[in-house]
Amino acid sequence: MGAFKQPHGGMLKELYLPEHKADEEKLSASEHASWDLSPRQLCDLDLLLNGAFSPLEGFMTQADYEKVCDEMRLESGVLWPMPITLDVGEEFAQGVAEGDTIALRDIEGVLIATMEVSDLWQPDKKREARRVYGSTDDTHPAVDYLMNNAGPVYLGGKVHGIEPATFYDFKLLRDTPSELRGRFRKLGWRKVVAYQTSKPLHRAQQELTFRAAREAEANLLIQPVVGMARADENDHFTRVRCYEHVLEQYPEQTTTLSLLNLAMRMGGPREAVWHAIIRKNYGCTHFIVGLDHAGPGNDRNGEPFYGPYDAQELFQQHEEELDITMVPLKMMVYVENKAEYLPVDETEPADKIISLSDPEFGRRLQEGLEIPEWFSYPKVVEELRRAHPPKHEQGFTVFFTGLSGSGKSTIANALMVKLLEDGSRPVTLLDGDIVRKNLSSELSFSKEHRDLNIQRIGFVASEITKNRGIAICAPIAPYANARRQVRDLITPLGGFMEVHVSTPIEVCESRDRKGLYAKARAGIIQGFTGVNDPYEIPERAEIVIDTQDLSPDLAAHRILITLEKLGYIR
C-alpha cells in the first residue's frame, strides 16, 4: 500500500498528552526534579514525542539498552539498532529514585515533557562504544560524546509530552510523521523514496536522487538533518536555502522537502538501519543508502571506521523485516563529451569524465575562485559563498595554552597590538586572569570548574569568531578534552589556531612574581598546574613556542607569519 503501510512496530507512538492532562502535568511539574536537556537530548526527545522513533515510548530502560547494544533489538524483539538514552550527572542521579517523575526542560527552562523513571544505572561506556560503533577511538564523534561528554548515569522510562520544542526557523518545512503521511495521502503519493543528507545538494546529487525516484516509479522526499550532524558541516540555515534552490530543478509535483530534527551519531551501518526506520515511520517506502552511509571518516590512525559497503550490507540483512526497500546510491560522474551526469557503470571507455573533489570545491569557495556550472547551480554557489567568505574576511581564534609563567599573556598582548595595527578586524583579548576576574569570579580551581571556565572562554570566542572578529585566548587550559571542545565549537565558524607555549616548568618557576609555585610546592596551594595537578600536553597544536630563547615580539611575529600562510591575514 505504499505510503500507507504500518509504522515500525505496527503503530505510530505519538507521546503528547491530551491538552487537559498536559495542563494538569504542568501544575504538578514544579514538585518534580528538573533536568535541562542538552541539544542532543532535546533532538531525541522531539523525535520520541512526535512518533519518529516509534515504537519507543521513552528513553530506554537498561534491559532494552543492553539488548539493543548486543543484538540490535528491543526486549520485545523488534529491530532497533541505536541506543536512545538519557544521560545525567551523578549529582542529579543521586536525587532520583525508581518510580519518581522528573521534568524535562529545554535550555530556557520550558517544560517539554515529564518522565516516569523506571530504571537508572551506570553503563559500561566502552562496551557500548565497541558494540554500537565498533570502536573506542574518540575521534569518532559518537564515541567522543559517549566517553567525554555524556553523564555517568542513564535514566530510563516512559515520557509524556507537554508541548513541542519551539523552532522559529523554517516552520513550514518541519513535519511530524503524521503530518507528512497526511501530505502524502493528500498528494496521492503511494511510493516515496527518501533521501537523507547533511550537506548541500549539487547537480550530481540532484541527478542521482531524481533517477532513484524515477527507477522506483516513486515520488521523492528530500529530508535533510537539521538537528545535529558533523561539526564541520555547513550551518543548517545555509543548507536549507540551498535545498530550496535545488528543489526548483525537479519536475513539479514530484518532490517535496521536509526537515528532520535528528541528532546523528555517525554510526555507519547501524545508523543506516536507524535512518530507514525513521523514514518508514514518516511514511516512506524506499530509502537511499550511500557508500559509507553516515560514516565519520577516518580514525586516529587514518583508517576508515567503516567499509564503503558495510551500511548497505547490514541494511540488506534486515531489509525484509524493515519493510522498506533499500535504494543503493549510484556513483554519478560528469561526462564532458555528453554534457550530462551518468552513473559510472553507464559510461563508455571513450567518455571524458571530469570531477571536482570536496576539498578542491572548498578551496575554490574559500579563495573566491570560479565554480564550474556543471558542478553546481549558481544560486547554490551564491549561498555558499555568502556563508564561506575568503579566509582573510573570516573571524578566527588564537588559543594559547601553557603553564603559569610560560609567557602566554605577554605574547597574547603583543599579538593583539600587531593585529590592531593591521586593522582588518576587531580584536578581543580573553586573558586567563582577566576572564577569571570578570567572567568566572565565582569558580574555584577544581577540575570541573576549570573546564567550565574554558567552556565560557570558548563560547565567547566562538561568538567573536562567528561575527568575523578575532579572539585571542590565553588561559592555562591544562586539560585536553576541554581544549578539544573549544576547537570543535569554533572550527565550523571560522579559523582556529592552538598555540602551545611550551616553556619548561623550571623557567616558569624562575619568573614567578607571585610565589605561586613555591606555595604549591610547600603544599599551601593545592591543584596547581604542573606541581600537584597535571598539564596534558597538546597533541594538535598548530604552533609550539618555547619562550626561554624567544622574545615576545618574535613569538608574536611567528604567529602572524603562520596566520598569513593560512590566509587569515594579508
Annotate each predicted stretch with a short phrase:
Residues 183, 187, 317-474, 478-509, ...:
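Glycine-rich phosphate-binding loop of ATP-dependent small-molecule kinases
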Residues 1-392:
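Active-site cores that bind ATP or allylic diphosphates and position pyrophosphate for catalysis
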